[in-house]
Amino acid sequence: MIVGIGIDITEIDRIAKGWGRFGDRFARRILHPHEVVRMPAANPVAFLAGRFAVKEAAVKALGTGFSDGIGPRDIEVGVAPAGAPQLVLHGKAAARMEALGATRTHVSLTHGRDTAAAVVILES
């Protein structure tokens, strides 16, 4: 049974401005440490935009937004063995998922020229 669903569209230009102004410091504010290690040097802005879209969709699925002690670094976008994005929740985000009775997550992520979009589904 679906216990939460969230969707987000992130403008890549908005992320590019943060990256241009703050660089690595910007990335470390929104990425989990495991994501920082996986961030490509070739196109970090698209990577950041995609990860941010998933994180926004995830907090919508959790029903909290970025509040109640849940921040972007509590949500990690990992990579499943087949290469698909995989949600890994930490801290209060993981506790909220457990409180909802969710045991599985589903993530879809796509990039366009100007936007990144993501859908997150939490399932019990």
Curated annotation (Swiss-Prot):
Pfam families: ACPS (PF01648). Its cofactor is Mg(2+). The keyword Magnesium applies. Its EC number is 2.7.8.7. Mg(2+) binds at residues 8, 56. Keywords: Cytoplasm, Fatty acid biosynthesis, Fatty acid metabolism, Lipid biosynthesis, Lipid metabolism, Magnesium, Metal-binding, Transferase. One of its GO terms (molecular function) is holo-[acyl-carrier-protein] synthase activity. The keyword Cytoplasm applies. GO terms for biological process: fatty acid biosynthetic process. It catalyses: apo-[ACP] + CoA = holo-[ACP] + adenosine 3',5'-bisphosphate + H(+). GO terms for cellular component: cytoplasm. It comes from the Bacteria. InterPro entries: 4-PPantetheinyl_Trfase_dom, 4-PPantetheinyl_Trfase_dom_sf, ACPS, Ppantetheine-prot_Trfase_dom. It is found in: Cytoplasm. Transfers the 4'-phosphopantetheine moiety from coenzyme A to a Ser of acyl-carrier-protein. Belongs to the P-Pant transferase superfamily. AcpS family. This is Holo-[acyl-carrier-protein] synthase.
